[in-house]
Each structure stands twice: as C-alpha cells, then as structure tokens.
C-alpha cells in the first residue's frame, strides 16, 4: 500500500480551561487523585465554540505549515463521535468553510479514540485515486456535550479539542497498519441523535485500559 508523508499539523482548543480543582467542587475528587491516576491537570470545555470552528482553525494552521492551499486538497476526512450535526457530515461542514474543490470528497469516520488512525489508513488507500495527492485529516471532539459532569469516572478524563494534519501520498514512504475492531457497548458507549433517555457517554475505564494494554 502507498505510504503517507505528514506535511503539516495544527490544533485548536476552546478558550475555557477547567482545572482538577474546578471539578473537585462538583464531584468527590482532588487534583492529587486525578494527576496520580491520569496525569491530567486541566482540560478544555467549549462554552460557545463549535466543532466546525475549531476544526477550521486547526485545518488552516496545518495547511499553512504544509505549504498547501485548500484548492490543492484531494480528500477531506474527519474522525469524530461528536459532530455538530448528523448530516451534513462534519467533514462536509469543514469542506464548505474552507471552500474546497467540489471534486474533493469529504466524509466522517466514527471510530472513537482510534479514529485518526483509521483516517490515515483510509487516506493512504484512497489518495492515489483522487484528483490531487493531498489530504486534510481532522480529528476532534466536543465530548463535554455528552459527558456527565457528575460522573467522576468520565468527567475527569474527557475534554474538547481538535487536531489536523495535511498528508501526501508517497509510494516510497514506509507504511504499516493493522486495523481491527471489537464492538462492546458495555465497555464504551456514546449516545446518538435523539437518545434523550441516555444523553451521556458511558465507559468502563478498567476494561478499556486492559484492552489498550493487551491489544492496542
């Protein structure tokens, strides 16, 4: 399979910083407890920013660093489980905001924490067939939208932010990826549109950690 070169990256974060001490005012926890178990000291929670706004900011930074213009892109992929809307796809919203060419396909991948890896593998497979050799890959979440702030097991871990990369197909670049899946909603589950009776994500952190160590 063709490989990829990462030409430029970018990121964008909401302005609102939430510290461990902030969360300790709401749930039974402390800065020391969180840091000792996760290494996390703060996270960002969006108050007014949309995923599209953050994604466009990150994408523009990646394009600038890569020296690639939006009109040179042949593919636009977004990895997310918390898009601004179900349709149009998050990738299409980014496509519109950046005024990408109409022959530049854009679609989302929903694969949780592995989403960006899926996006890289997908772009490596598709780019040789696209009109231009560059792809914009965006990975981002606004997980504060679906996180129960009274659930200590999840609210201390998740936050909001976006990363982006501009990649180029390269048949000579070394490339190896081995993808798989193990679907289990008892371990990790996030709500879909209209699921008001279960509005928050659920995660069995110990099982996810075990799976990551043994398999990922």
Where do the protein language model's features map onto the residues?
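Condensing-enzyme catalytic core mediating Claisen C-C bond formation in acyl metabolism
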Residues: 1-48, 151-214
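Conserved beta-strand elements of the Class I
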Residues: 5, 74-77, 136
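Acidic, glycine-rich active-site loops and adjacent beta-strand->loop/helix elements
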Residues: 12, 79-84, 111-114, 139-144, ...
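Short acidic, glycine/serine/threonine-rich loops at helix termini
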Residues: 17-18, 87-89, 120, 147-151
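Conserved catalytic cysteine-centered active-site region
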Residues: 33-37, 41-53, 81-134
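Phosphate/pyrophosphate-binding loops at sites that engage ATP/ADP/AMP, CoA/4′-phosphopantetheine
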Residues: 58-74
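Short, well-ordered, mixed-charge alpha-helical segments that flank or form enzyme active sites
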Residues: 85-87, 115-118, 143-147, 183-185
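Flexible, glycine-rich active-site loops centered on histidine and acidic residues
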Residues: 128-161
